């Protein structure tokens, strides 16, 4: 008989017995399957209490349902690519792979000590070539179907380090490492056409109602941001257009000479207010800004260098900084556009509050009925024209009226209610070739290019003769090279001549590999499917096994992933269904967002003290206390 209870000895004994007996090993094909999954961790080096709380919830569900006769799949793996490993390589001179795998080993030991009921036979790490081979395979399928494509995109660029920075590496407009002011630079990048799935992603949120937190569904709906409205064509009339040809790019010259116009397309959800548009604003990045500023200067109405300085200032600000900026700032471009509704000439500006990523990157400004436009108009003394009369009294000197009402000052549309006017004005503009009904989305295609080493290589090469050529499937995986230099400057993959210089799979001539790697969200967008069949070396996963285990019955993770990981995973599921590889429309049946552990409690020791426990106490007691704490706060 045991003289003294020693939780560590007892835990080790039973954990060993569980492992030897394969107690938590999932059984293929048995009835009553149940798939429990917590979002897998980045191997940062240490398990913290955020992990423990998350995994305790999953463990409790898995154990309970196992005792109720369910055939449980409860796997664990590692979201192992990422920037911290590369930073460690630069700072400490340790290779990202060595740093990552050492962290995985340590964290796996910690998880085993905690006694979670994982089927470790299904363990995956996204940095293993056996895993990222299938990232590359999926990418090639997307390329075949036109879902993956390449175009130039603006990125955060550090001129000193000659490298691209993630948003989190930009601190107050400067490089986090060297302090150099960042600039927005256009670089060729790979995109995934998630917008092609926008309507399905939006529509299928209805299937998740009552199963996912309402807050997550609302965030995804807002992120997709479907807006019904109209595309309206304002235009700048140019007399003697031949005098301005050197201001204009080639693609606009024919229209300019033929029609003596430069068109500015704007998207609006309020076509009923078009008669109240008193100015037009273009995003600083809009390609027409330098064109119109050049023309404006020639006309003597604007100073091109002032416009250029404003645009450069905006380039040094992130989208987030511009969105949060309360002060409206802009510059007149020196030209006037014709409002197609009433023929009025209205000034064209560029301003900080208009983003090129949304709509067309240009807006018609109706300061009487849009608060941002009202603030801008007040600052720059621009006219405010009321065209929607509210039911009650409204002081337009104090702010814009953004609601619906009855149209006034709108020519033949006076007296119509806003909703009727939206439809009739859109039809009227369409008949005149100056507008059309349009659906716009806030959602933008996903830029997956990262100018970094520790990620999945993008499987294409560039040949002088053949152009861009996909790497054949039988040559996958394209592996990361080991002979790279980590200096913090430039793209590390470009330092490996062995990697960069290759032969064209099509003609056998000289070629250069793509040196961008994939966004790590690509890795986590389908890992839940790989857990169903993690050892498969012939395909990403067996359709039969995925049909048995999927969808994930309970998925557990933080709400901070609501509009990135969770949206991307849904997108991948739908794309893979289009390929005939999966059956289900949605990957996760029920979602639990467990809430964030406050930073001061992330330390294991601090939380143990708070719970009245020590490192010598039972692991099961810790789990019990965490569950009780969660129940009290639910």
From Swiss-Prot:
One of its GO terms (cellular component) is cytosol. It is found in: Cytoplasm. The keyword Nucleotide-binding applies. It is an enzyme of class 6 (ligase). Gene3D superfamilies: HUPs, Valyl/Leucyl/Isoleucyl-tRNA synthetase, editing domain. Keywords: Aminoacyl-tRNA synthetase, ATP-binding, Cytoplasm, Ligase, Nucleotide-binding, Protein biosynthesis. It catalyses: tRNA(Leu) + L-leucine + ATP = L-leucyl-tRNA(Leu) + AMP + diphosphate. GO terms for molecular function: aminoacyl-tRNA deacylase activity; ATP binding; leucine-tRNA ligase activity. Transmembrane segments: none annotated. GO terms for biological process: leucyl-tRNA aminoacylation. Its EC number is 6.1.1.4. NCBIfam families: leuS_bact. Belongs to the class-I aminoacyl-tRNA synthetase family. Seems to consist of an alpha chain and a beta chain. This is Leucine--tRNA ligase subunit alpha. It comes from Aquifex aeolicus (strain VF5). The lineage of its organism: Bacteria, Pseudomonadati, Aquificota, Aquificia, Aquificales.
